[in-house]
Amino acid sequence: MSKKKLLFLPKYPRKGASSRLRTFQYLPLWEKMGYSVTVNSFFTEKYLNTIYDHQSPGYWHVLTCYFRRFSLLFSVQKYDLIIIEKEIFPYLPAFAEWFLSKVNQYWVDYDDAVFHNYDQKDNFMVSLLMPKKIDHVMKMANRVIVGNDYLKKRAEVAGAKKIEVFPTVIDPKKYKVKEDQSPFKTITIGWIGSPSTLKYLDPIVPILDWIHEHYPIKFLLVNGKSKMKFKGRIESIPWTEDGEVDAILKMDIGIMPLPDNPWERGKCAYKLIQYMACGLPVVASPIGMNKDVVIHGENGFLANSKEEWISALGELITDPQLRKEFGCKGREKVLNEFTMEGNFYRYKKLVELELGD
């Protein structure tokens, strides 16, 4: 029997977090199960590196990405199933998805609220001409895969045929557990993220400054070349895929502040899942999926106001036993609900059902 052929169309190469976690980390498992897998990322690693360096990737380079993806459409019929991350062509109408729905079957995957790039975009022409672009992509798909309930609700409103929730998860084999929660040391509060999300730390800097004045802390920023305006001691570590777990293990407390905006409500709380996989206690804003991952007072704290953040951080800084208890409960939750293999075998059953295996 010939191998079933899967075509994955992620937005980014492996270096892009969403594509790495929603597509690339599963590829060895698909191949191990006997599937023939082809991957075609829309943007290139050169594009990502340019964006992360806060530079423009250049008109011609971006145009090349569009042409390369367009040429792929002439060979889509040879695949048994096509799985798209978000959309085929960013900021173009859903003509490609319409074409695909006529000649093959496709699924589409979302781990953030990309539909707000269209219905709440500052660009007047985008909002005017394509406010429901992602809704159309969802409706034409055979199945919509989403990372959380906020995205699921949008797929329901769009009229998606079938919807499945698959959280963004970790491979637990890669995540060691932090052991040292000694009371006799400087406490490291940490954050991991891409340069584009560093802005989420801005509102919390005054809180960290206050904490620094009252407790022995330092701040660890796993963020590449970016900096933040913190009055206390700060350590900045460039992000690498191979080094991210070791970087998290340098932390004692992991944080995930977020504003209460539509885009942020669609986030999948991946930072928290990473922290908790390493046995860290967490403090997070009660926004979107953060409220599902953090059980307040059991594996971390949810904090909204300045007073709540100060109280939560202060309690964890001064109580090593509480840090350990929260960390154990957090890791347990991750192992039960947010693992790569758990996701994969559910996903595989759906593919088998779709293809009649």
Annotated model-derived regions:
Residues 41, 105-107, 114-115, 139-177:
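Donor nucleotide-sugar binding/catalytic pocket of nucleotide-sugar-dependent glycosyltransferases
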Residues 295-307, 315-321:
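Conserved acidic donor-binding segment of nucleotide-sugar-dependent glycosyltransferases
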Residues 274-284:
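Short hydrophobic beta-strand element within catalytic cores of glycosyltransferases
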Residues 142, 248-266, 280-281:
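Acidic donor-binding loop of glycosyltransferase active sites
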Residues 266, 286-297, 301-302:
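Short acidic/histidine- and often glycine-rich active-site loop of Leloir-type glycosyltransferases
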Residues 67-79, 90-108, 112-115, 124-144:
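Membrane-proximal helix-turn-helix segments that form the acceptor-binding/catalytic region
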Residues 315, 322-337, 343-349:
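A short, well-ordered alpha-helix in the C-terminal region of glycosyltransferases
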Residues 14-29, 39-40, 171-175, 182-249:
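Conserved catalytic-core segment of nucleotide-activated headgroup transferases in glycan assembly
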